[in-house]
């Protein structure tokens, strides 16, 4: 559900509220826009693509991580999804009960476990991801190819900077 204030209204209100503060308004607007775009994108994808498949955003990200990385350790999936290992445990339980995911104890170290997609999980991802990508295309449809390239490069720099500041550590 979108905010009842537009992005410009929010930025204008924040700038006037903080007019006397020594802040970097451009940085505030940029990071605020990243958050707002991420939330709007996540809500759109959840409502239009994932909900019909009875998947949460977190459930999808866990399935996607396992699909992409093969048979990763649970701690790698938790980090990739940006969730705690405790949260991952609940998500794995739900996805396993649906028959999409399998958890296997490491044979070399019992403290670790690996996740893998079941045949049903593989089928789900192979059917779902093209729909997900269509949603991604909708979200960037108003950008020119050059704008899309510039946006992607700029966001990758922000991610790299955030990770360098320690943002990639476990939740």
Task: Kindly give the residue locations of the regions a language model identified.
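C-terminal regulatory/oligomerization modules of transcriptional regulators
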Residues: 1-22, 149-171
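Charged, amphipathic alpha-helical coiled-coil/dimerization segments
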Residues: 93-153
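Alpha-helical residues within the helix-turn-helix
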Residues: 51, 79, 96-97
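N-terminal leader segment of winged-helix/HTH proteins
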Residues: 1-53
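Short, locally clustered residues in the helix-turn-helix/winged-helix DNA-binding domain
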Residues: 35, 39, 64-68, 129, ...
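Short capping segments at the starts of secondary-structure elements
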Residues: 69-73
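Short alpha-helical "packing" element that flanks the helix-turn-helix/winged-helix DNA-binding module
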Residues: 59-63
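Helix-turn-helix DNA-binding motif, specifically the short coil turn and the N-cap/start of the second
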Residues: 84-87
């Amino acid at each position: 559900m979108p905010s009842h204030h537009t992005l410009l209204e929010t930025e204008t209100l924040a700038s006037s509220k903080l007019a006397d503060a020594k802040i970097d308004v451009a940085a505030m607007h940029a990071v605020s826009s990243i958050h707002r775009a991420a939330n709007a994108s996540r809500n759109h994808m959840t409502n239009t693509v994932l909900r019909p498949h009875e998947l949460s955003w977190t459930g999808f990200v866990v399935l996607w991580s396992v699909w992409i990385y093969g048979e990763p350790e649970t701690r790698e999936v938790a980090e990739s999804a940006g969730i705690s290992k405790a949260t991952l445990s609940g998500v794995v339980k739900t996805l396993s009960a649906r028959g999409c995911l399998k958890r296997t104890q490491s044979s070399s170290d019992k403290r670790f476990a690996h996740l893998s997609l079941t045949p049903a999980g593989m089928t789900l991802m192979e059917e779902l991801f093209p729909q997900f990508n269509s949603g991604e295309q909708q979200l960037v449809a108003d950008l020119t190819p050059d704008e899309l390239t510039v946006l992607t490069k700029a966001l990758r720099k922000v991610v790299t900077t955030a990770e360098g500041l320690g943002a990639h550590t476990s939740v």
